[in-house]
Regions:
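Bacterial N-terminal signal peptides that target proteins for export
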Residues: 2-12
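C-terminal motif of bacterial Sec signal peptides marking the signal peptidase cleavage site
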Residues: 22-24
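Accessory "access/gating" subregions that flank catalytic or transport cores
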Residues: 41, 147, 156-165, 176-184, ...
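Active-site cavity-forming subdomains of large catalytic enzyme subunits
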Residues: 47, 51, 55, 59, ...
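Catalytic phosphate/nucleotide-handling subdomain of diverse soluble enzymes
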Residues: 59, 63, 70, 74-83, ...
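Active-site-surrounding "flap" and adjacent substrate/cofactor-binding loops of secreted or lumenal enzymes
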Residues: 66-97, 103-106, 123-137
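Glycan-recognition and processing domains
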Residues: 387-473
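Beta-strand-rich ligand-recognition modules
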Residues: 457-524
Length: 524
């Protein structure tokens, strides 16, 4: 008893749920050059559009801040006010720097391309990415753990190595790609291949491909309907992602004045997450398909109006800051920075010169760097750059490779067993796979009963995120049906952590046992 008491003042491992899976069977005038596939923009307009992309994205993030994941599987009613006012961007900048994660992760990649050149290798991008100092979650953190432990891309984003592979992580950080490839959508998808497979694959990768295409094409298209339909051509037909967005286009045609009916159709058919253990069989849904569909809804029903489009995307719920951010960014490109209403733009200007958390990048710097990268990409693609204008070599979209995660694999039940353990945990299940969802929790300064109460109510993740520098690494031996399958490391340090202690897919169908044995429970 004394040993156990002494131990509990140090560390405990909380496994909250196991999910078992088995297989079943200012609108700018873009002038085409006569007789060619070139579009002309003045340099001033090009830079205005790039600025509009970054500004619109950041505005959307802040607008959705108070409702981010507050409405899961439900619309945000019109009666629920979403505030915006002078000083509001700076308020959130000071209150919650992590809110801007989809902007500063974007900027991290901008910095990588700036430091190492436009031909930077996937491996170099991954190394740069994995050694960032800020908090990450879902597919981003899973890939960072993989890379730090020797699993390099594309394996780092592959679903068997990353249960979050279909999550929207790449979708919310692909904006920069379209901004550096104006009108050159196939160059955008090539960069998306290099970057997006670091953290995602399948539908999760397609989310970023789709977003980068939207941004790229917004430089040369003024019609949101044409924009969405053309960007969708980058996604292979027959994939779930393509089918989902195609449904949104279809429902917009059926209900052209009723976005809420289209939203309900979307919920009925597509609101089901098969991969992310935080969302399976729960209302939380961070899957790239449905969140990209909310982006499409905002663009299609917003009719190019910044305020209406951003508002619709936010009121779809779920990731209600990132989705309006994408919509705001795309329309910022289409119409330009100078066309964003002052109501939205003035509060943003207060933070434009400030560096984002854990970066040396500000919006003001991003405006200049992305403009420079766009000019360099234009030169590489055979575009023409004159003193006052550029000729953009417009590209018809070519679909990227076919990928589909979790084929013939889907969740069948979620078993919540609130339990902490200090040495060994054993679990029996029927199926062909499982995933444990829980966190390593340090008890040195927190009463264990309090940890148990909070974990049972809201999960243990809040405790798992609280250790920015703890060097302790738990070591687990994982036995499947009595045979050692893997030894895994679970770092306490936030930026090094493994999100899920263990998972396994595509076992032989039947009855199985998984046992976790903690090899070093007392780090002192």
């Amino acid at each position: 008893m004394n040993d156990l008491t002494r131990y509990f003042t140090k560390i405990a491992l909380a496994f909250l749920s196991a999910m078992v899976l088995f297989s079943g069977c200012k609108q700018d005038e873009k002038k085409p050059v006569a007789g060619s596939e070139m579009f002309v923009l003045t340099k001033e307009n090009l830079q205005d559009k790039i600025k509009g992309g970054w500004a619109g994205q950041t505005i959307g993030v802040v607008y959705g801040a108070p409702v981010e994941f507050k409405y899961q599987g439900s619309l945000i009613p019109d009666e629920q006010n979403i505030p915006w006012r002078e000083g509001y961007v700076k308020y959130w900048w000071d209150k919650k720097p992590g809110l801007f994660d989809d902007v500063y992760t974007d900027l991290n990649f901008v910095a990588a391309f700036e430091n190492y050149g436009l031909d930077i290798s996937q491996e170099k991008i991954a190394e740069h990415w994995a050694n960032t100092a800020y908090h990450l979650a879902h597919a981003n953190q899973a890939s960072r753990y993989n890379i730090l432990n020797g699993i390099m891309p594309p394996a780092s984003g592959f679903w068997k190595n990353n249960p979050h592979a279909d999550d929207l992580d790449f979708q919310i950080e692909a904006d920069f790609i379209g901004l550096m490839t104006p009108g050159m959508v196939n160059q955008a998808t090539e960069i998306a291949d290099r970057v997006g497979h670091i953290m995602n694959s399948g539908d999760g990768w397609y989310g970023g491909v789709f977003v980068s295409a939207l941004y790229s094409l917004a430089f040369v298209k003024n019609n949101p309907i044409e924009l969405v339909e053309t960007a969708l051509q980058t996604i292979p037909e027959g994939t779930k992602f393509h089918n989902c967005i195609a449904d949104v286009v279809k429902w917009h045609q059926q209900y052209p004045n009723d976005w809420k009916t289209a939203w309900f159709e979307l919920q009925k058919k597509w609101n089901f997450d098969v991969g992310c253990p935080k969302g399976c069989f729960l209302s939380f849904n961070i899957d790239a398909k449905i969140n990209s569909a909310y982006v499409a809804l905002g663009l299609l029903y917003g009719n190019g109006d910044f305020t209406r489009s951003v508002n619709i995307a936010a009121r779809c719920g779920q990731d209600a800051d990132c989705n309006p951010a994408t919509v705001g960014g795309v329309l910022g490109v289409m119409n330009g920075y100078s066309s964003i209403p002052a109501f939205w733009l003035n509060p943003l200007k207060e933070i434009e010169p400030l560096n984002f958390e854990n970066t040396s990048m500000s919006l003001s710097k991003a405006y200049e760097i992305s403009y420079r990268h766009a000019l360099q990409m234009l030169e590489k693609a055979g575009g023409k750059i004159d003193e006052n204008q550029v000729e953009i070599p417009y590209q018809s979209p070519v679909a990227v490779a076919f990928e589909q995660n979790f084929e013939k694999t889907f969740p069948v039940y979620r078993d919540r067993f609130d339990r902490s353990f200090t040495s060994e945990l054993s679990y029996d299940f029927t199926g062909n796979g499982y995933i444990f969802y829980g966190n390593l929790v340090k008890c040195a300064k927190i009463d264990k009963d309090y940890i148990d109460r909070v974990s049972k109510r809201v999960g243990s993740e809040v405790f798992g995120l609280a250790e920015p520098d703890d060097p302790y690494i738990a070591v687990l031996d994982v036995y499947i049906d009595g045979t050692l399958d893997e030894t895994v490391n679970l770092p306490m340090k936030n930026t090094s952590r493994r999100l899920e202690p263990h998972w396994k897919y595509q076992l032989t169908e039947g009855n199985h046992n998984v046992t976790l044995k903690w090899k070093n429970p007392d780090p002192a």
